[in-house]
């Protein structure tokens, strides 16, 4: 049987394009603005408050300018500010002029207030503020107008400038300090609720004050004249420079906030806001009245930024009695599990364990700098994703910041240079005049209460019990009936559940999703299918769930959540689960445990589509009443009482049930009183679990999925497959455990792609976008979820449920329906990439002859069949709902721009050589170069032979230069115009970067955004290994994030790096469409990118988890229109060229993309089809039958494609574009880009599910009909004047480059000198390639080097630095030497201090680095060939290494060698704790037994001493026999038989493969 929806009446323009039930377009913090920054503090313990410290804070702020951003006017800053102590000496002048006595110390409260500019509104605001202050029994002393110089502001900042005044208040005797701050906090909260428009209180305290504004950092002190006044003194300062993805100045969003300066992004914000809103109804703390606590609410607000909300949560804890340090520990906890260092501090683990059951972490990259005036401190997130460097002087002066070297302190006075490691804190107790280090801080907080005892007594843990093996149903037919009724299809069982049970991992697939969106499909879909997973890109990074799993957890807690504000033993009364998937045995244990459990059925009597809404209302009412009656756990179950669902019964979809109950309990103020468990038949894939947890479920029992596993294992066919060896033999318990393991691994991946470590933080966070759900439904059950195009009502959902129900009743077929959602099948779901489409295209491109003089009729006929096939398709994509709306008469084709002009806008997708065969990859490149278009190298480097222009092609189209290709012409080149820089940095060398016209930073991939990649060893041939600087057969891992891009300012730095090495190449950034991409793109434009590429969710892939292909990302139509709109609104559209890709197949697609704002167009899968791909959909198996996507030699020989076929395809596309332009009456694509007024909603479309779609978000773009100036882009953006320009301008340097001679030069550096040496490297590589330069240039530097010092260094270059360096030293280093030593006057021991930052030697393809000191996190991450000696490192050292040699002469952090598949590393372990810090998944740790290994180690240390004079190195060499036994050697499997690791192996000459 095949079930289809009945077609509804055709849509009309009005019913689709407009809808009174307006869709929700997203929270402001998601779609309007994200931010990042540079942040830090300065404190002086011993001295009195002075003005010098304030001056130094302003200077430090100025040194962070490159971490900030500016508005479209390039002058108005995104925000800068300082927090200091109250400047009493300055304010004394105000009191003196008024003959007022100045209140003592902490009896004076000062509010820094942004008031309306309009005088009458200002008076109203002042009066209300004074009224509220007096109600708090405080005395208003007066208002002080803050002196400012508005002339220094940018145009936009000036237009939005508030009137700035300070209100001065005092309190009665006995009310000072903390009590005064409490009253000011209450007053400010009350004031803020009424005066929200054009009004903001920056700070209101008796201890701290905040000066901030929408200015550049160097302007802050010029604007606020107070800050330059010698009477402005302080003993501490917190400073912050903001980079916003928006350009509309908003003064209140500058930082610091009231307590906090935040660098990073909270990924879990919506969940944190929802849970904090739930807590507001139950706030209770001794010493506070209920009325006072209610006055504080709402504490958080969806309209505010992540930093603002985190500050608000932090302030609640601080003002109710916690120190800022303890509050930060609660809200942003460290990863205390799997932390060897905490074994000596069990109380700290107990503290975090206790609060893990009360407070979900605010998760995401974060350097927090905070102060309440008594304490000033800083803390880092659990993953250490922001830099934090500090130094301490001998007279207890401490400077901490995002970069080293921002304050110029005498080197002789510095006693310590350090960094915060992941989860660590440092603080200054200003009252006690003490510097507090990490464990001292945490012990102090953890020992206040017996948290460990409370947990031991109160908490119950549900162990992972064995699964029930007894089947629920007696016969297979009943199972099929239940599966059908609950929405299973044959593919769900065979391609999802069975692989999970048999293999213990999620199924992998390829080629992307080419089926209709759920709301557009004529097939029934589950409610889950309307939700698209969001993911991290640019503003925060994804994380690696495999290699960095030690910081992740799926643990969940059941029961009532206790009072966050007052620790009590009973708050630990919870049940802890290892993961949210509970089996039947575990569910029963929960029901019989210590907490009150109640079941609520989600079944209802089937009585038409309206019966679901009635059942839902009843469910919500029952849930509320049950919780009010004392239930602590609510089990929402769709298990029928009679064991099976009957013909007259249906069920509320579990996602709808849990979302509705979750939100209605929040609204009723009951959510924290009970946890929700979902006991359901309709949950089997990882996406289903993620949705349920994301909308409020704490645990899920997928009873029908578990039953499906049992039935599969018991099936005779399964047993026979195991008997004959076609399936691995496993028993039933193993199959059930495999299923659980697969779900858990999939959940880790879904969390990690958003950059979230803990499921507790994902819980209720709603990190999805709904596509196709109506506003009423969303508000009812999924409030706060973006749903831009509207869609289904509750009745429509009921209709889908009934369709599935109709498959099972009254009579079930003999097998489950196969709708072909994954694999194409005749009669199944429509697939854009079908065999029919492929065949017609193959015929067209084969028949077309360039210059055919009118003889191409047959070719055009075939192309017309191809075009019609796609034109007449069922509605599949959002663009299919639109049609052209010409506003002028058609013109003749001769008047339209040429094919040759149009094809220059075309690009191929970034498909790697590794995913594609060499033949297919080079064929695409040659074709695009013939067209004057652009091919993309993808990840993996490129053979230098491809940079040649062919001049040896014979009459048969063959060339000895590229003998494996056919159909060649003289003048061809296989050089990819676009060179991709992906997270693995494989083959990214100076020569590679210099050979590109564009350099593409791949932030995400359409088919698997937020995920990394892995090229299996079997695909790494000798040729691939040569290109990627690896060894054949070694698995090559591309991390999920770029490890030098954790935020928008990090991306700006990489863009800067690429512009630095190749100033003639454009830099593009590839993003994937998701809600909020517009504001991300605005940040990318401000980060100085030249091109932004928006990929749709339907992009192709060589291999990806099936759940990612189907459920991650959004359509490019939503992405392109959002980006175009935001860039236009922010006056940034002229800065970047916009490119669209994802499922483009015809000229009609190109014109649609152009009308929506795209200027260039990417083609991936379809270009492969044009060269011969037959859509076999086996890319992920390495068995492509036509040699397109395989590395197997025998299969590659089957490749028959020639460049001409691809050329022909793009000519067809361009001709179609021309005909459509003529039809619209326009002469060029430039004339129609961004012109959505030329689009209208189709009136002839018939959708089967809803008439409630609204396409306003696609059609309502800024009117650009007249103003087209934004299409005029600067060819390549500049970095402006840089130190390298001065170096290159030196005649001696020019002489050395041009004549390969020797030159030595000396320069001073500061931290704003970034990417030093790289432009010199590019100039050499352009002339000589990677290895051809035989001269030698030595550059000596002194000072604090900015980021990316020595990036892409080349052979023949030596950089020697006295001082210190920030992050990314030696990034992409290809050769030469980098030497870094402390300043000559430094008095500290180098081996105990930090000298270089995070992520150094990232992706190095050669060279040597010697650093006389310690490095930060992720040293030598993805190192390919580089060698280095350092004297200590942070976490994740040598992560993903594939080659090279690393020596560490000091302590390291945890997770050493994670994902390390090649190379060797040596670690000096004087403490004996290295084994517990190693990630043992791949590498083996062994002592050095091979003589070649000892020789290698000693020679590198010897070289280190020669270059740096290292005292530690000298001591080791002087006592070699004593030290040798303390070294460990980390050896991956690929190196176990190398002579350095294995003394039994003789040294043989290594084979070197060169390009062929």
From Swiss-Prot:
It is an enzyme of class 1 (oxidoreductase). GO terms for biological process: ammonia assimilation cycle; glutamate biosynthetic process; L-glutamate biosynthetic process. Residues 1533-1556 are annotated as: Disordered. The keyword Flavoprotein applies. The active site is at 37 (for gatase activity). Residues 37-431 form the Glutamine amidotransferase type-2 domain. GO terms for molecular function: 3 iron, 4 sulfur cluster binding; glutamate synthase (ferredoxin) activity; glutamate synthase activity; metal ion binding. [3Fe-4S] cluster binds at residues 1173, 1179, 1184. It holds the Pfam family Glu_syn_central. Pathway: Amino-acid biosynthesis; L-glutamate biosynthesis via GLT pathway; L-glutamate from 2-oxoglutarate and L-glutamine (ferredoxin route): step 1/1; Energy metabolism; nitrogen metabolism. Binds 1 [3Fe-4S] cluster. Keywords: 3Fe-4S, Amino-acid biosynthesis, FAD, Flavoprotein, FMN, Glutamate biosynthesis, Glutamine amidotransferase, Iron, Iron-sulfur, Metal-binding, Oxidoreductase. It catalyses: 2 oxidized [2Fe-2S]-[ferredoxin] + 2 L-glutamate = L-glutamine + 2 reduced [2Fe-2S]-[ferredoxin] + 2-oxoglutarate + 2 H(+). Its cofactor is [3Fe-4S] cluster; FAD; FMN. Its EC number is 1.4.7.1. PANTHER family: FAD NADPH DEHYDROGENASE/OXIDOREDUCTASE (PTHR11938), GLUTAMATE SYNTHASE (NADH) (PTHR11938:SF133). Belongs to the glutamate synthase family. This is Ferredoxin-dependent glutamate synthase 2. It comes from Synechocystis sp. (strain ATCC 27184 / PCC 6803 / Kazusa).
């Amino acid at each position: 049987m095949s079930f289809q929806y009945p077609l509804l009446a055709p849509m009309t323009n009005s019913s689709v394009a407009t809808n009174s039930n307006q869709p929700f377009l997203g929270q402001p913090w998601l779609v309007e603005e994200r931010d990042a920054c540079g942040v830090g503090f300065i404190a002086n313990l011993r001295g009195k408050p002075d003005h010098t410290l304030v001056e130094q804070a302003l200077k430090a702020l100025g040194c962070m300018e490159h971490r900030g951003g500016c508005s479209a006017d390039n002058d108005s800053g995104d925000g800068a500010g300082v927090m200091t102590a109250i400047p009493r000496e300055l304010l004394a002048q105000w009191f003196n002029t008024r003959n007022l006595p100045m209140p003592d110390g902490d009896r004076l409260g000062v509010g820094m207030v942004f008031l309306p500019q309009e005088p009458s509104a200002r008076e109203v605001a002042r009066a209300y503020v004074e009224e509220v202050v007096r109600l708090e029994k405080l005395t208003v002393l007066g208002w002080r107008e803050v002196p400012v110089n508005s002339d220094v502001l940018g145009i936009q900042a000036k237009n939005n400038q508030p009137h700035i005044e300070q209100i001065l208040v005092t309190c009665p005797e006995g009310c000072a300090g903390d009590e005064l701050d409490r009253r000011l906090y209450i007053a400010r909260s009350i004031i803020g609720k009424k005066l929200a428009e054009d009004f903001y209180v920056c700070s209101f305290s008796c201890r701290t004050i905040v000066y901030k504004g929408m200015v550049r950092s160097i302007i802050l002190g010029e604007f606020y004249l107070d800050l330059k006044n010698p009477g402005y003194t302080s003993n501490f300062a917190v400073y912050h420079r903001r980079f916003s993805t928006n350009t509309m100045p908003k003064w209140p969003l500058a930082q610091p906030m009231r307590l906090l300066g935040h660098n990073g992004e909270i990924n879990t914000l919506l969940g944190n806001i929802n849970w904090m809103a739930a807590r507001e109804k139950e706030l209770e703390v001794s010493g506070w009245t209920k009325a006072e606590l209610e006055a504080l609410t709402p504490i958080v607000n969806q309209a505010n930024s992540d930093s603002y909300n985190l500050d608000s949560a932090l302030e609640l804890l601080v003002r109710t009695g916690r120190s800022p340090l303890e509050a930060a520990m609660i809200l942003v906890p460290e990863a205390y599990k799997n932390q060897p260092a905490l074994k000596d501090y069990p109380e700290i683990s107990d503290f975090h364990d206790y609060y893990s059951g009360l407070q979900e972490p605010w998760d995401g990259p974060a350097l927090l700098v905070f102060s309440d005036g008594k304490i000033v401190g800083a803390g880092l997130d659990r993953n250490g994703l922001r830099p934090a460097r500090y130094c301490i002087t001998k007279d207890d002066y401490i400077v901490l910041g995002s970069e080293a070297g921002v304050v110029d302190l005498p080197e002789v006075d510095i006693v310590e240079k350090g960094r915060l490691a992941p989860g660590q804190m440092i603080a200054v107790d200003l009252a006690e005049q003490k510097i507090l280090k990490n464990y001292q801080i945490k012990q102090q907080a953890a020992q206040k209460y017996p948290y460990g005892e409370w947990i031991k007594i109160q908490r119950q843990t549900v162990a992972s019990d064995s699964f029930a093996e007894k089947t629920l149903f007696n016969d297979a037919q009943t199972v099929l009936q239940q599966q059908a009724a609950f929405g299973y299809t044959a593919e769900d069982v065979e391609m999802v559940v069975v692989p999970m049970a048999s293999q213990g991992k999620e199924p992998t697939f390829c080629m992307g999703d080419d089926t209709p969106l759920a709301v557009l499909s004529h097939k029934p879909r589950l409610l889950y299918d309307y939700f698209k997973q969001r993911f991290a890109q640019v503003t925060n990074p994804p994380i690696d769930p495999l290699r960095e799993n030690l910081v992740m957890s799926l643990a969940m807690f059941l029961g009532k959540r206790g009072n966050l504000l007052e620790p009590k033993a009973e708050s630990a009364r919870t049940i802890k689960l290892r993961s949210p998937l509970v089996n039947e045995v575990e569910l029963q244990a929960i029901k019989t445990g210590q907490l009150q459990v109640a079941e609520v059925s989600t079944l209802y009597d089937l009585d038409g589509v309206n019966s679901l809404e009635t059942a839902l209302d009843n469910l919500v009412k029952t849930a509320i009443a049950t919780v009010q009656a004392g239930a602590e756990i609510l089990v929402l179950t769709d298990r029928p009482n009679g064991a099976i669902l009957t013909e007259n019964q249906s069920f509320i979809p579990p996602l709808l049930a849990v979302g509705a109950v979750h939100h209605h309990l929040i609204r009723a103020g009951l959510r924290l009183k009970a946890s929700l468990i979902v006991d359901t038949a309709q949950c089997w894939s990882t996406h289903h679990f993620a949705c349920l947890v994301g909308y409020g479920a704490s645990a899920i029992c997928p009873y029908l999925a578990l039953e499906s596993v049992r039935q599969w294992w018991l099936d005779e066919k399964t047993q026979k497959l195991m008997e004959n060896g076609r399936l691995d033999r496993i028993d039933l318990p193993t199959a059930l455990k495999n299923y659980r393991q697969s779900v858990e691994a999939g959940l880790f991946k879904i969390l990690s792609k958003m950059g979230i470590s803990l499921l507790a933080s994902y819980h209720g966070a709603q990190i999805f976008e709904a596509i196709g759900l109506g506003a009423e439904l969303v508000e009812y059950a999924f409030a706060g979820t973006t749903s831009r195009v509207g869609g289904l009502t509750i009745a429509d959902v009921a209709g889908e449920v009934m369709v599935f129900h109709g498959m099972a009743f009254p009579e079930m077929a003999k097998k489950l329906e196969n709708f072909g959602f994954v694999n194409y099948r005749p009669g199944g779901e429509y697939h854009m990439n079908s065999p029919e489409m492929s065949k017609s295209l193959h015929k067209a491109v084969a028949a077309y002859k360039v210059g055919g003089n009118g003889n191409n009729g047959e070719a055009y006929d075939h192309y017309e069949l191809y075009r019609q096939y796609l034109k007449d398709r069922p509605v599949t994509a959002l663009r299919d709902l639109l049609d052209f709306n010409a506003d002028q008469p058609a013109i003749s084709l001769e008047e339209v721009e040429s094919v040759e002009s149009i094809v220059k806008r075309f690009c191929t997708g970034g498909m790697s050589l590794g995913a594609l065969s060499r033949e297919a990859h080079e064929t695409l490149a040659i074709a695009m170069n013939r067209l004057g278009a652009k091919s993309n190298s993808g990840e993996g480097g490129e053979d230098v032979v491809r940079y040649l222009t062919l001049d040896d092609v014979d009459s048969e189209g063959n060339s000895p230069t590229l003998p494996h290709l056919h159909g060649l012409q003289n003048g061809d080149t296989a050089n990819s115009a676009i060179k991709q820089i992906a997270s693995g940095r494989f083959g990214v060398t100076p020569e590679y970067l210099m050979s590109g016209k564009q350099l593409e930073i791949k932030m995400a991939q359409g088919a698997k955004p937020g995920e990394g990649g892995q090229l299996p060893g079997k695909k790494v041939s000798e040729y691939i290994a040569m290109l990627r600087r690896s060894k054949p057969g070694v698995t090559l891992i591309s991390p999920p994030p770029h490890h030098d891009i954790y935020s928008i300012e990090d991306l700006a730095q990489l863009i800067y790096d690429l512009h630095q090495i190749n100033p003639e190449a454009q830099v593009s950034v590839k993003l994937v469409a998701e809600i909020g991409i517009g504001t991300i793109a605005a940040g990318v434009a401000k980060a100085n990118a030249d091109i932004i590429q928006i990929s749709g969710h339907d992009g192709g892939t060589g291999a990806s988890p099936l759940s990612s292909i189907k459920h991650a990302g959004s359509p490019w139509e939503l992405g392109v229109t959002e980006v175009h709109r935001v860039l236009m609104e922010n006056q940034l559209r002229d800065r970047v060229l916009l490119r669209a890709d994802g499922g483009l197949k015809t000229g009609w697609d190109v014109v649609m993309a152009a009308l929506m704002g795209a200027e260039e167009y990417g083609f991936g899968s379809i270009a492969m089809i044009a060269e011969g791909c037959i859509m076999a959909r086996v890319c992920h198996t390495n068995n492509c039958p036509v040699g397109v996507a395989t590395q197997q030699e025998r299969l590659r020989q089957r490749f028959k494609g020639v460049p001409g076929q691809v050329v022909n395809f793009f000519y067809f596309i361009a001709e179609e574009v021309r005909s459509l332009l003529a039809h619209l009456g326009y002469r060029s694509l430039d004339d129609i880009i961004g012109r959505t007024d030329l689009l209208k909603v189709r009136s002839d479309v018939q959708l089967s599910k809803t008439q409630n779609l609204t396409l306003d978000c696609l059609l309502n773009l800024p009117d650009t009909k007249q103003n087209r100036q934004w299409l005029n882009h600067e060819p390549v953006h500049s970095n402006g004047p840089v130190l390298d320009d001065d170096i290159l301008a030196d005649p001696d340097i020019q002489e050395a480059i041009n004549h390969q001679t020797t030159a030595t030069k000396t320069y001073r550096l500061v931290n704003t000198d970034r990417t030093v040496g790289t432009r010199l490297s590019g100039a050499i590589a352009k002339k000589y390639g990677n290895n051809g330069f035989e001269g030698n240039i030595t550059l000596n530097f002194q000072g604090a080097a900015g980021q990316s010092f020595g990036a892409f260094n080349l052979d023949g270059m030596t950089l020697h630095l006295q001082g210190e360096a920030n992050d990314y030293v030696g990034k992409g280093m290809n050769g030469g030497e980098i030497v870094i030593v402390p300043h000559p006057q430094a008095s500290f021991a180098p081996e105990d201090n930090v000298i270089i930052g995070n992520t150094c030697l990232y992706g190095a393809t050669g060279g040597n680095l010697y650093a006389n000191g310690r490095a930060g996190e992720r040293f030598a991450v993805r190192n390919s060939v580089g060698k280095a000696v350092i004297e200590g490192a942070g976490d994740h050292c040598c992560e993903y290494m594939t080659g090279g040699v690393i020596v560490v002469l000091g302590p390291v952090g945890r997770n050493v060698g994670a994902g390390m598949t090649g190379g060797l590393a040596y670690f000096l372990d004087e403490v004996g704790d290295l084994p517990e810090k190693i990630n043992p998944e791949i590498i083996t740790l062994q002592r050095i037994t091979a003589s070649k290994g000892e020789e290698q180690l000693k020679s590198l240390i010897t070289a280190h001493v020669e270059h740096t004079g290292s005292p530690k190195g000298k001591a080791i060499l002087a006592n070699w026999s004593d030290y040798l036994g303390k070294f460990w050697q980390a050896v991956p499997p690929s190196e176990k038989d190398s002579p350095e690791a294995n003394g039994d192996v003789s040294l043989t000459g290594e084979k070197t493969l060169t390009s062929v």
